[in-house]
Amino acid sequence: NKERVYERACEIVDETTKDMVAGVAYHWYSGDHFETLQMVREDFPELMLMRSEGCVEYARGKEHVQDDMRHARMYAHDLIGDLNHGMNSWLDWNLVLDEQGGPNHVGNFCNAPVMCDTVTDTVEYKPMFHVIGQFGRYIRPGAVRVGCSSFSPEVEVTAAQNPDGSVAVVI
């Protein structure tokens, strides 16, 4: 998980292995820990930082309570924080799930950006889908993050300069 990504990079990357390690992957489940990404970025600038898994799990044994806007805010917060601290790529674990939040072999059913109801044969695009879309639509492949700031900690923001010279700001 993210809180140990710096420690793990220090353990894995040395003079012998530095040419064999292209990046480090992490998950988001233990909290923000954005400062650990910044530490990896500063001490290992050549490494890719890859958020390789994240999802919003339903509480086990409880009715599937969906707070779609809260989940969308969680995604936006994580994407902005990770980008602002050196992340190179971000992957969701479950982009598309069924109406139960599965299928899943261990019973940890999840909410997802796209939910397909196999009973009614309908597709629902959740707010998480649109949050992910805001980043992918405006921050293009090959973009470089540029500095930005916010007047309030309640307004999170990131910015990047795209290869065509345009600047994308995502709030």
For each predicted feature, which ranges?
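Active-site neighborhood of glycoside hydrolase catalytic domains
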Residues: 1-59
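Short, solvent-exposed polar/charged micro-motifs at secondary-structure junctions
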Residues: 4-8, 102, 154-158
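Short amphipathic alpha-helical segments with coiled-coil-like heptad repeat character
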Residues: 32-33, 139-143
